[in-house]
Amino acid sequence: MPEPVLAITQIHGIAGRRDELRALMRDTETATAAEEGRRLYRFTVTLDDPDEYVHVQEWASEETWKAHQRSRAFNDYQRSLFDLLARPSEMAIHRGARTTRPAPSGPPDPRSLD
């Protein structure tokens, strides 16, 4: 059975190019939506800095992740990043680790927060 691939990237945008970078991220999310093996492909902004992002991708297998790396969507994204980043991104790739997804807990009882 193929093992999943999880890639997490820290992206460092330039404040003056924020709108362009966010538009590129949105377009890339849309462009990858139909790729085989794509389980999750999401860009998020950090809480403390509106120009720092986290990109999380989950792929069904090494093969589907590699296919994405060769895709037009990935290549278009990479080419468009050139003038939008303050410094190079940092990526961590996790392969085949067991994943546990706990059942969601209910909303907290507001009385317990006192």
Task: Identify the role of each PLM range.
Residues 27-39, 58-92:
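An amphipathic, aromatic/His-enriched active-site/gating alpha helix that lines ligand/cofactor pockets
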Residues 1-2, 33-36, 49-53:
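Short hydrophobic/aromatic-rich motifs at helix boundaries and adjacent loops
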Residues 3-5, 20, 36-38:
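Short, flexible segments with low predicted structural confidence
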Residues 1-3, 42-49, 79-114:
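Glycine-rich beta-strand-turn "strand-cap" elements at beta-sheet edges
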Residues 5-12, 42-69:
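Short, well-ordered beta-strand segments in beta-rich or mixed alpha/beta enzyme
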Residues 12-21:
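Short, surface-exposed ligand-recognition loops at beta-strand->loop->(often short) alpha-helix junctions
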